[in-house]
A protein has these predicted regions:
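Generic C-terminus detector
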Residues: 282-305
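A structural signal for short hydrophobic beta-strand segments in well-ordered beta-sheet cores
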Residues: 24, 171-174, 267
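Conserved N-terminal catalytic core of the sugar/cofactor nucleotidyltransferase
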Residues: 1-8, 32-119, 126-127, 131, ...
Length: 305
């Protein structure tokens, strides 16, 4: 069996969630957290390694809540995303407190990855179908010449909306099943008729709820890490003095690779509903959703019993 890894980005500070570490909030009937379901679905689909990207200061609590339990059923590795972990002679601006973004998070796992891998957010529930499709893509043989072949799980925007506040989504532009561009779209709100994005000037634009969006679930290769590292150096070199919030984002880098002809991204559409704990108010509805999935037999009571 070809080795494949699930890489979980769990280093976010959870600033929108309020008190507590949102990635570790129990949501399942037996106290499971969202990552339990993600790992369950990934292992069921054929993944056989899990890499947690976390902050070093959260390591002990993280292992207690989930890490040690998962290490009993599959291979586990840890990578630490630290704000001062920068290449070469780059140094962190003294007043920067914001993490460097999803690109930097994945780069933190470079030393523990030598196999094809899927990347997900720790606090997102993706459903079962996406793991099967991404895993099956990663174990296929792809042409070695030409652009690098990677994939993305595409979710319908209407299946990813939030009842309790605004969200950011990477809206995808697709031709013949290939991703041709990603537009990072901010301030998306659920409306009675669907969805809209609200601009700073007070105007709003209606969005197509059937359009596919990126939920940061990518199927990538070890070779991608080299490009990711080079891109981060270029990103740091291009930051204007005084900019302490600019982030190195995975969708933006992949967008650049597509336009330069360096990557071909296959979009694997999933019709599953996404949900996650973005805001404190989301927790009750997410708990109810997992209870229903359990009652309906999608998941057993007690995932790993």
């Amino acid at each position: 069996m070809k080795k494949t890894a699930l890489v979980i980005m769990a280093a976010g500070i959870g600033s929108r969630f309020g008190k507590g570490i949102k990635q570790l909030a129990p949501v399942g009937p037996k106290g499971e957290i969202i990552m339990d379901y993600s790992i369950h679905d990934a292992l069921e689909a054929g993944f056989n390694k899990v890499v947690f990207i976390i902050r070093k200061d959260l390591e002990d609590e993280f292992k207690k809540v989930i890490g040690d339990r998962i290490s009993n059923i599959t291979e586990v590795a840890y990578a630490f995303q630290e704000i001062d972990d920068l290449p070469g002679n780059f140094t962190k601006p003294a007043d920067r407190t914001k993490p460097w973004g999803t690109g930097h998070a994945v780069l933190a796992a470079k030393k523990v990855l030598s196999e094809p891998f899927a990347v997900i957010n720790a606090d997102d529930y993706y459903g079962k179908e996406a793991y099967v499709k991404v895993h099956d893509y990663l174990v296929q043989d792809h042409p070695q010449d030409g652009p690098m072949h990677i994939c993305m799980a595409g979710f319908r925007l209407g299946n990813t909306l939030n009842d309790n506040g605004s969200i950011t989504r990477g809206v995808c532009h697709i031709e013949d099943g290939k991703l041709v561009g990603v537009t990072e779209t901010h301030n998306i709100f659920k409306t009675a008729d669907g969805a809209e994005t609200r601009n700073d000037d007070g105007t709003a634009e209606t969005l197509d709820t059937k359009s596919l969006v990126s939920m940061n679930m990518w199927g990538l290769t070890p070779e991608f890490m080299e490009i990711l590292e080079k891109g981060f150096v270029e990103f740091l070199g291009g930051i204007k003095e005084g900019d302490i919030k600019k982030e190195y984002l995975l969708p933006e880098l992949i967008d650049q690779l597509i336009h330069s002809g360096k990557a071909a991204v296959d979009v694997l559409e999933t019709k599953d509903e996404w949900f996650g704990v973005t805001y404190q108010e989301d927790k009750a509805s997410v708990q109810a959703a997992f209870k229903k999935l359990t009652d309906d037999g999608v998941y057993p009571e007690g995932l790993y019993q």
